[in-house]
Amino acid sequence: MSSICKGDNSDLTEERKNATFDTDKMAAVIYGREEIASRRRQLTESISRIHELAESKPLVFMTREEKIAESCRKLEVLSRHWNQTPFNRDNEEDALHIYREVLGMEGHPLALHDTMFIPTLVAQASQEQQEKWLGRARRKEIIGCYAQTEMGHGTNLRKLETTATYSPDTQEFILNTPTITALKWWPGALGKSSNNAIVVANLLIKDQNYGPHPFMVQLRDEKTHIPLKGIVVGDIGPKMAFNGADNGYLGFNNHRIPRTNLLMRHTKVEANGTYIKPSHAKIGYSSMVKVRSRMAMDQGLFLASALVIAVRYSAVRRQGFLEDKTQKVKVLDYQTQQHRLFPSLARAYAFIFTGFETIHLYSQLLKDVDMGNTSGMADLHALTSGLKSVVTHQTGEGIEQARMACGEHGYSMASYISEIYGVAIGGCTYEGENMVMLLQLARYLVKSVELIKSGEEKKLGPMVSYLAAKGGHPDLSSLNGYVTAFEHMARRQAWKATEKFLKLMETGESREVAWNKSAVELTRASRLHTRLFIIEAFMRRVSRIEDIPVKEVLTDLLHLHVNYELLDVATYALEFMSSTQLDYIRDQLYLYLEKIRPSAVSLVDSFQISDMQLRSVLGRRDGNVYENLFKWAKSSPLNKSDVLPSVDKYLKPMMEKAKL
C-alpha cells in the first residue's frame, strides 16, 4: 500500500487503500532490486533534512540567471553536507538521483560532468590518464563537459570540422575551429561552468585525417576561471526548457594541448606521429552508445513524472456525473481519461525495464572490449539508435497527453508538466536526430536481410534472428502470440523496405539515391523492430518477478501494453490478422483499462518520486491541490504590488487620455 498520512486528500487516500500490492516491493521491481529502491528512499530522506536546500521561491518564478545561481548555491550546499547522506561519489546512480531531487529538471553545472565527462574518462582514457584526471573529476576539483556537436554538424560525426593537428616538433595537438559552423554548439555546462571538456575533433597527422577522436582540453584557468589563450567560449542563450543549464559554444584558434591529452585507451599517437588505430572502427562512439543505452530508462522516468502528476490529479479532480447524480465523478473514472493515461503508464514501465537491459548490455560491451572482443558493438549501436528514437518520441507524446489530461491547470507551470515535456523532448534531437537514428538501425536490418538472402543467416545476431523465421498466424490467447504478431509485422516490413531499396539500385539508382527513396519504409521497419524489443524486455522483466501481487498487476499492465501497441500499428497487420482478431484486441484493451484502474494511483506512487523532485502543485503526494494552487499563484512576482509600475506609466495615462 502507498503511504497514507493524516491530512491527505480523502480521494487519494481511498485510491491508496484499494492497492493490492506493496508499493515498496513494486519500486524494487522498477529500480532493479530492493537495495537500490531502498537506497533511493534513504538518499531522498537524508536530502530532505538539509534545510539550506529549500528554495526561496519556485524555480518557475526565477530568471535564468537566478536559476543558474540557485543551482550553483545548492551544489555548494551539497558539497558541505555529503557526510550527512549515504551518497557514494563513485556511484553514478547516486549522483543522478540526488541531482534530480535537489535541482529538478531545469539543468545544472554538473549535468554532463557525471553523465558524459566522467564516463568517457572511464571508457576511453588510459590507466595513466585516469590516474591523472579521474580522481580530480570525481572529487569535483575540476568540472567537465562533453563537446562534440557543432553549430553545423550534429549527428554526422564524419563531417565534424574541429581539427586537432599533431606537431611532432613540440609533441602537441593544435586545435582549431576553421569556420563558423565548426564552433562547438549545445554542450551542457560548457558556456560558463566547466573548466575542462572532452572535445571531439578530427585528428590530423601530416595532412592525413584519421577522423573524430576525443581530447581532454582545459578551457579555463583553475584559479580565475578566465578562458585560456586561443579559446572563445560562452552561453548560447535561452532554450525551450533546461534553462538552469548554460549550454554553450566553443571555438579554438591555434590552441595547443599536450600529445598525452588524446584519450588513449583504445588508440594512440606516438611521439614521432605514428598512429595506432583502435581494435574497432567505431570504438570512439562508445560514449554516445553509453548515453543512448540509458536514455530509455531516463525517458521512462520523465514519462513517469508526468504520469504521477496526471494520474494523481485525475483522482482528485471531480467533474460530471454518471449513475450517482449526488456526487461528481473522479476524472480518472472516465474511460477516455484512462485510455489517455494508462497506455503511457505501461510504456513508462516498459521503457524503464528496457533501459536496465541496455545498460547491462553496455556494461557487458565494455568488459568485452577490454578483452579485445568488439563483436557486440554493431548490435548495441543499432539497438540503442532505434530505442533512442522510438522512446523519446513516444515519451514526448505521452507527456503531452498527460498535460492535456490535467485540463486548463495542466497548461499552468504549477503543473510542471510543460517543463518535463521541454526537457524530455530535447531527447528527440540530442545524441542524434531521431530520423537519422532510425536509418542507422535500418542499415543494420538491411544487412541482416541481405545475409538471409545470401544463405548466411547463421551470421545473424540474436536480436534479428526472427527475420529468418517463417511466418505464422498468432494465437492471441497468450502473450507469446502477441510477440509472434509483432515479429511477423516487423519481419515483413524489414523485407519490404529492403526489397524496395535493392530494386531501386537494380534499376540504376545510386545507393545513396535508392536509400533516400526508401527512407520512409526503412524508418517504419526500424520502429517495428524497436517496439518488438521493448515488448520482449517488458515480458522478460515480468517473468522474473517473485512477489505474486506485484506480478499480477504488472501482468495486467503488460497485457494492456501489448494490446495497445498492436492496435497502434494495426495497419501493418492487414492480410495477416482478421477484423475479428482486431476487434478482440480492442476489447482486451478496454478490459485491461478497467483492470488497471483500481491500481493506477499506487502504480504511479511506486515510482517514489518525491514532491521535492516533482515540483508540481497538481501532483502533490497529499493531493491537497486547490489550496496550494492558490498559494502558488499568490507567490507570483507580479503580485508583490497591487499596481504594476507599467500600469502607472502607460495604461493609466492612456485611459485618462481616452476620457478627454
UniProtKB/Swiss-Prot annotation:
An example GO CC term for this entry is: peroxisome
Q: Which residues bind ATP?
A: 339, 389, 393, 401, 524-527, 572
Please name the pathway: Lipid metabolism; peroxisomal fatty acid beta-oxidation
Binding-site residues for FAD, renumbered to this chain: 146-149, 154-155, 188, 317, 337-340, 433
Q: Which phenotype arises from disrupting this gene?
A: RNAi-mediated knockdown abolishes production of dauer pheromone daumone 2, severely reduces production of daumone 3 and increases production of daumone 1.
Q: Where is the motif Microbody targeting signal annotated in this sequence?
A: 658-660
Which UniProt key words apply to this protein? Answer: ATP-binding, FAD, Fatty acid metabolism, Flavoprotein, Lipid metabolism, Nucleotide-binding, Oxidoreductase, Peroxisome
Q: Cite the EC number.
A: 1.3.3.-
**What does the entry list as the binding residues for substrate?**
282-285, 292, 430-431
Query: Where does the UniProt entry say this protein principally localizes?
Result: other
The catalysed reaction is: asc-C7-CoA + O2 = asc-DeltaC7-CoA + H2O2
**Regulation of this protein's activity per its record:** Activated by ATP. ATP binding leads to a conformational change that promotes FAD cofactor binding and enzyme activity. ATP binding likely occurs during acox-1.3 folding and/or dimer formation.
> Where, by residue number, is the active site?
431 (proton acceptor)
Where can this protein be found? Peroxisome
Q: Which Gene Ontology molecular-function terms are recorded?
A: acyl-CoA oxidase activity; ATP binding; FAD binding; fatty acid binding; flavin adenine dinucleotide binding
- GO terms (BP aspect): ascaroside biosynthetic process; fatty acid beta-oxidation using acyl-CoA oxidase; pheromone biosynthetic process
Q: What family does the Swiss-Prot or TrEMBL record give for this protein?
A: Belongs to the acyl-CoA oxidase family.
The record ties this protein, via PANTHER family, to: ELECTRON TRANSPORT OXIDOREDUCTASE, PEROXISOMAL ACYL-COENZYME A OXIDASE 1
Q: What does this protein do?
A: Involved in the first step of peroxisomal beta-oxidation by catalyzing the desaturation of fatty acid-derived side chains of ascaroside pheromones, which regulates development and behavior. Specifically, shortens ascarosides with a 7-carbon side chain (asc-C7). Does not catalyze the desaturation of fatty acids or hydroxylated fatty acids. Involved in the biosynthesis of asc-C6-MK (daumone 2) and asc-delta-C9 (daumone 3) but not asc-C7 (daumone 1); daumones are pheromones produced during unfavourable growth conditions which promote entry into the dauer stage.
| Name of this protein | Acyl-coenzyme A oxidase acox-1.3
Q: Which organism is it from?
A: Caenorhabditis elegans
